[in-house]
């Protein structure tokens, strides 16, 4: 266990950051699952816009790598485009 005041503060800050990042990742994952489960193209398009923004935000905040976000967006776009109108 850390003894220095700054180290204790760093532990608290890291924990808070971890919880915030985990919450954002979990929320995004839930929306991705919801998008993959959708069968109506109009609904999927709306959800895709939202999920795309969420992935971009995660990449911007360095929670996930920008290429990871780009790959996920690409796969989701293919999925949405394959849906029957």
Swiss-Prot record:
Give me any GO biological process, just one.
translation
Which molecular function terms from Gene Ontology are attached?
small ribosomal subunit rRNA binding; structural constituent of ribosome
Q: Which UniProt keywords apply?
A: Ribonucleoprotein, Ribosomal protein, RNA-binding, rRNA-binding
Q: Which Pfam families match?
A: Ribosomal_S20p (PF01649)
Give the CC-aspect GO terms.
cytosol; small ribosomal subunit
**Gene3D superfamilies on file:** Ribosomal protein S20
**In which domain of life is the source organism classified?**
Bacteria
Supply the InterPro entries for this chain. Ribosomal_bS20, Ribosomal_bS20_sf
Q: What does this protein do?
A: Binds directly to 16S ribosomal RNA.
Record-stated family:
Belongs to the bacterial ribosomal protein bS20 family.
Q: Which PANTHER family match?
A: 30S RIBOSOMAL PROTEIN S20, SMALL RIBOSOMAL SUBUNIT PROTEIN BS20C
What protein is this chain from?
Small ribosomal subunit protein bS20
Q: Source species, please?
A: Cytophaga hutchinsonii (strain ATCC 33406 / DSM 1761 / CIP 103989 / NBRC 15051 / NCIMB 9469 / D465)
